[in-house]
Each structure stands twice: as C-alpha cells, then as structure tokens.
C-alpha cells in the first residue's frame, strides 16, 4: 500500500516557528523527515517528488531530442523524483530486474523513460529497446537514458504510449533543485508500507507526527492513501462509465425485446406451415432446426453490411478511441460477441413458439388456418 504525505511549513503564528530558518533549511528538514520515515519499522521505502505522484490532477512537462535530430522533440510528463520513487510505486524494468535496478539507474546525468516513450513520434531516431543507453538533449544539457520501464498509464481511463496519458521522462530531483521549489508544500513525500501492516498505520503515524516528524519549520500536515487519491481523481470518469452502462442496458433491453418479439411473432404466424410439414412426415427436430437456421441466416445476411459500416466508423475514428485504441483484434472480438448476443436473442425468440407449435396436432392447426 502506498500513501502520500502532505507537507507544510509553520507560519509566524505558530509558537514553534523559527524565522531564522531559510528555504535551504526547510529542504534539509524535509529530507530528514524522509529519512526518519524510511527507518520506521512499518515503512518499506520513501521518496520525494514534485508533481509526480500517480493520479495527480496536474503534471509538469519535459522534452528531449536526439543529438542528430533537432526537428523532433519528444514531449511528455516530467517525473521529477528521487530514485526511490520507482521502488515506492513499483515500476518494472523491461529487462526483468525489477525496481531496484531503476533506483540505481537514476542519477543527476541520467533519465528513465518507458519503452514506448517515442512510439507516438514516428520520425524519432530511436524507438523501443533501441532507446537504452542513448544520449539525449534536454534544454542545454545532455542526459543518458539509463533504463527503460514497462509501459504505464496515467490512470485507468487512459491508454499507454501517448504523451501526458502514459509516457513520462523520469528526471533526478537533486537537493539544489528542491530549493528552487522554495516551499515544501509544493513537494510530495510518498511512502510504501510493508506487507501485512494493518489499516491503523496512518493514525499511528499522525500520533507521532508532532513529536518525531516535525523538523524546524517543516511538519506533516496529513497522510492520504493513494487509493483515496485515485478515487478522487477518477470519480468523474467512474460516474460517466456508470451512466454509459445504464444507457447500454436500456438499449440492450429494447433490442432484446424487439428481436425476440419479431421472431416470436414470425414463428407464431407459421403454425400452419409447421403443421403441414408434420403432416407430410417431417419430424419435430428437423422443423425446429430449420426455424433456427432461418433466423441465423437472416442474422448473417444483415451482419455483413453492418460489419463494413462498423469497421469504417472505427477506422475513421468517428467514435472515441482515446481510452482504447481501435485494433483489428478488438474489432473482431466485438463483432463476435455482438453476433453471439444477437444469435441468442433470435434463438430465444424462435424457441418457445416453435416448441408450442410442434405440440399442436396437424389437423387442429390446419383447421385453425
């Protein structure tokens, strides 16, 4: 489990406020608090970052280019962090070495990027695993790509591989750079608790906050589990998804009743035909299969133009594909599921009236006709 500590600075209204402490002293105090937290028996790892925690409402941007290509700048989110960030949030190295190698890879002259960071830019010099070890230019400084992580997403409602929705540039947050932020409230202190720690950890930590985790003018204002940050960040998308599911259920119910009703009425109207076939020697099983086959044949004939129309709608991006890319496998799966759903509706619409028709004696059905 991960938590984010909200840091703050005492004001002159507090009796503990020391007006002689500078910004540099505040940042030193923040690092001291991070060190004390890392030694807590229930804490696994601690990191400091700036505008970089997952599900954060805002983000910073960064760009780099390759030295031999000054026309293509790869722009995306800037993950400005201390190395332990990759341990706290469990980023995975593509070489299978886990997060420990990422912690060692991030230094002042290196960056870490996901393996798909350049996929959005087809004219970039390098892509994929070829990025590893390459020199890049950021502002007026050269950096080396020291490690590649597996693709990540900004949240559950975005796809990986696109700028500001998944890809990022992981840069080193040095002591000097922390001082340029000036206020500890603009920095994030995140920690991961050990496995098996109960839900009372936050309460126990805050009980010790004033005694142990206040250094100089810097103190812990609040501790927020990342699950709550995620809920707050995704609540609008969650509500929209629920609304869409309600609309989808309503439409499916109407389609379900319409298709079943149509084939029910159609089969009911053919009672005389069923009786005549039975009178001519056809058995019930063959008649039933014939009615089902006719329904599925009508479905297949209407499905062909529907598939062509649906493919063109997706291919031309007339529908929203920002949250899930339009791919051939996805399209085929959707078509197959739709066909099966419609087939079930048709079978249900034919099943009961067909069985009822076959129970009627041929002479009685012909007399009714």
Where are these regions (language model features)?
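Mid-to-C-terminal secondary-structure elements
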Residues: 51-232
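Transmembrane alpha-helical interface segments in multi-pass membrane proteins
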Residues: 251, 272-318, 333-337, 341, ...
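Alpha-helical transmembrane segments of integral membrane proteins
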Residues: 1-17, 273, 361-369
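Intracellular coupling helices
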Residues: 257-294, 359-368
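Membrane-proximal extracellular/periplasmic loop immediately following the first transmembrane helix
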Residues: 4-73, 78-79
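Hydrophobic alpha-helical transmembrane segments of multi-pass inner-membrane transport and secretion
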Residues: 1-4, 237-272, 297-309, 341-348
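Membrane-helix entry/capping segments
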Residues: 213-248, 269, 314-337
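C-terminal membrane-exit region of the final transmembrane helix in multipass inner-membrane proteins
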Residues: 338-369
């Amino acid at each position: 489990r991960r938590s984010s500590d909200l840091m703050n600075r005492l004001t002159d209204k507090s009796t503990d406020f020391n007006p002689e402490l500078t910004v540099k002293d505040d940042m030193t105090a923040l690092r001291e608090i991070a060190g004390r937290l890392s030694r807590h028996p229930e804490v696994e790892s601690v990191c400091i970052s700036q505008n970089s925690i997952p599900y954060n409402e805002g983000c910073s941007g960064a760009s780099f280019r390759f030295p031999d290509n000054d026309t293509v700048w790869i722009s995306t989110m800037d993950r400005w962090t201390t190395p332990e960030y990759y341990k706290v949030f469990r980023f995975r190295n593509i070489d299978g070495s886990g997060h420990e190698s990422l912690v060692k890879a991030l230094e002042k002259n290196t960056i870490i990027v996901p393996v798909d960071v350049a996929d959005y830019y087809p004219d970039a010099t390098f892509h994929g695993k070829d990025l590893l070890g390459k020199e890049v230019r950021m502002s007026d400084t050269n950096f080396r790509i020291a490690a590649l992580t597996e693709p990540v997403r900004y949240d559950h409602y975005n796809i990986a591989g696109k700028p500001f929705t998944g890809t990022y540039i992981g840069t080193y947050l040095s002591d000097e750079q922390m001082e340029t932020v000036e206020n500890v409230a603009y920095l994030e202190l995140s920690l991961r608790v050990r496995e098996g720690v109960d839900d009372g950890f936050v309460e126990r930590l805050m009980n010790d906050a004033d005694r142990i985790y206040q250094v100089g003018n810097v103190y812990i204002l609040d501790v927020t589990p990342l699950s709550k940050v995620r809920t707050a960040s995704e609540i609008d998308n969650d509500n929209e998804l629920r609304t869409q599911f309600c609309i989808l259920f309503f439409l499916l119910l109407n389609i379900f009743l319409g298709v079943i009703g149509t084939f029910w009425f159609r089969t009911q109207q053919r009672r005389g035909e069923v009786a005549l076939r039975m009178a001519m020697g056809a058995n019930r099983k063959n008649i039933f299969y014939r009615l089902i086959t006719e329904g599925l044949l009508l479905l297949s004939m209407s499905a062909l133009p529907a598939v062509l129309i649906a493919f063109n709608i997706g291919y031309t991006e007339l529908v929203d594909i920002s949250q899930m890319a339009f791919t051939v496998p996805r399209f085929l799966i959707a078509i197959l599921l739709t066909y099966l759903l419609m087939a079930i509706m048709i079978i249900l619409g034919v099943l009961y009236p067909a069985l009822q028709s076959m129970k009627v004696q041929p002479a009685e059905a012909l007399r009714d006709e």
